[in-house]
Amino acid sequence: MYGIALDLGTSGFRTQLIDLETKETLKTVITMGHPLPGGNVMDHLDFAITTGEDVAHEVIIETIRRMFLQFDIDLSRVERLAVCGNPIQLSLFQNTEIRDLAYAGENKQKMLGVRNVKRDARVFPASEIFGEKYLSNCEIIVPPAIKHEIGADALAMMLETDFLIQPEPSLVTDYGTNAEMALKIGDRIITASAAAGPAIEGQGISSGMLASPGAICDVKPEGQYWRIIVLDREMEKQDAYLIDPVKGEIKDSYGFEAVGITGTGVISAFAMALKGGLIEKFPKLPNGKLILGPGIEITEKDVEEAGKAIGAIRAAHMTLIVESGIKYEDLEYAYMSGASGAYVDAEDARRLGAAPGYAKKIVQFGNTSLALARELVLEKSRLDDVIEIAKKITADHLMMATSETFNNFYLCELSYWTQGMPLETYDQMLELYGLPPLPKILEHVTIEKRVSKDIEEVGSGGLSILKEIGIILEVPVEKCVYCKKCVKECPEAALEIVERDGQRIAKYDSQKCLGTSCRRCVGVCPEDAIDITKLKITAK
């Protein structure tokens, strides 16, 4: 019999097939992006609210079906499926209430009839989600949230690291599009999240990609050249070639080719450029770009996008410290999890602010959400332990969106990354806001890397990547005059207009569509023909 572990991440899904008798991982399948339109969790939530939770649920479930097909097994032999993710992803997966996550105000929730929403642990038949004929002998395990806004993924990053047992002030961050984080001071825990955006994982930048084979994940200096480091088919780091980042001259290739760059590669490139004097102030680059391989470049626009992500994380870290009442120098441990937390050079991350440069010890982990799901697959009784621990964690949640401290920090970060504001001016601005100056970066810290890759074991069947999920959303456009302005305006080539049975239809690739943060197609239409609230799923 088999078990399946599933991580519903904001930037993509990860799943593993496990032999329940031998406890061996047999195969790993990942997607190269989230199936819902948008680049962050709030985009996904907005899509579900606007278009309908049933549609969002259907897109997610169809994506999971397509991932499970990659296992090439008789799915009736799957006995257990454990699913982990943030509250929004897990609610959409289960097709349960999400409006409490969309509307923070109690009056608004009461007006909508939203009351006493609980996100407790659940064990239920897979037929409730997938129907009677699919996973017919399987039960689904969903771990609990700590609070409605502190989900199973946040619980996982606390459980799968040493975070909860540390007596000294400690910070844990799951580096991803939504950047979940928690600060522990004695028995007190403060949680938060920073909507860093997709650039932190390599999306939304010109040559960017999620961590996968061929992705540049790191760079190292060798004289005037940079050694490009890529991920191989087993997701291990491998030296590729030397390149002059200004001229693009390549030499000394080891045979590994790069096809794009991850967010961790971008962080390393920025750190190298600063050390080597190629960057004096952001976002300016020599000749307007850094060349990392044939067709692989970092532009000044990419610097701005990545800087917004790094800046959001640094601002959130500093906000947690300031609001908690401790000093920067009190922070003992910083735990880094997720793909970006695993692959990034922690020293580079410290120098740029993606990791707290004032923490005395940094420990790097991998995908803690998938790790917890795997534990629940292998040992169902582990859920009882998780529930008990979740009950004991009394966490306060700090909303960055309404925090004046965060807003002030982030304004300074934006000025630093997008306008080249000097650090001296940054400190002057902080003084005006009544905030402490930027923390000093410690020169001698302990960095411990406990994993070599995001997912330690991909299994004997290897890693399968679902690059194109292939889910299409359609809506009739009766007033369409076939000018195709919407198609030309779409920055991701996610849209096409077709005629079928005498009717014009707008077809969206759900994975490519930028969702709420874009909607250029709606704005540019001269006939106001596109009603995104009526989108429905169809096959590609």
Curated annotation (Swiss-Prot):
PROSITE patterns for the chain: 4FE4S_FER_1, 4FE4S_FER_2
Annotated positions binding [4Fe-4S] cluster 1: C480, C483, C486, C525
Alphabetized Gene3D superfamilies for the sequence: 3.30.70.20, Domain of unknown function (DUF4445)
Keywords linked to the UniProt accession: 4Fe-4S, Iron, Iron-sulfur, Metal-binding, Methanogenesis, Oxidoreductase
A biological process term (GO) from this entry: methanogenesis
Residues that coordinate or bind [4Fe-4S] cluster 2: C490, C513, C518, C521
Pathway: One-carbon metabolism; methanogenesis from methylamine; One-carbon metabolism; methanogenesis from dimethylamine; One-carbon metabolism; methanogenesis from trimethylamine
Cofactor(s) listed in the protein's UniProt record: [4Fe-4S] cluster
Catalysed reaction, written as an equation: 2 Co(II)-[methylamine-specific corrinoid protein] + AH2 + ATP + H2O = 2 Co(I)-[methylamine-specific corrinoid protein] + A + ADP + phosphate + 3 H(+); 2 Co(II)-[dimethylamine-specific corrinoid protein] + AH2 + ATP + H2O = 2 Co(I)-[dimethylamine-specific corrinoid protein] + A + ADP + phosphate + 3 H(+); 2 Co(II)-[trimethylamine-specific corrinoid protein] + AH2 + ATP + H2O = 2 Co(I)-[trimethylamine-specific corrinoid protein] + A + ADP + phosphate + 3 H(+)
Domain 4Fe-4S ferredoxin-type, residue spans: 471-500, 504-535
Top-rank taxon, per record: Archaea
Cofactor details (free text): Binds 2 [4Fe-4S] clusters.
Keyword Cell membrane: no
Any one GO molecular-function label of the UniProt entry: metal ion binding
EC number(s) recorded for this UniProt protein: 1.16.99.1
One Pfam family cited in the UniProt record for this chain: Raco_middle
PANTHER family: IRON-SULFUR CLUSTER PROTEIN (PTHR42895:SF2), IRON-SULFUR CLUSTER-BINDING PROTEIN-RELATED (PTHR42895)
Subunit structure: Monomer.
Function summary: Reductase required for the activation of corrinoid-dependent methylamine methyltransferase reactions during methanogenesis. Mediates the ATP-dependent reduction of corrinoid proteins from the inactive cobalt(II) state to the active cobalt(I) state. Acts on the corrinoid proteins involved in methanogenesis from monomethylamine (MMA), dimethylamine (DMA) and trimethylamine (TMA), namely MtmC, MtbC and MttC, respectively.
Protein name: [Co(II) methylated amine-specific corrinoid protein] reductase
Organism the protein comes from: Methanosarcina barkeri
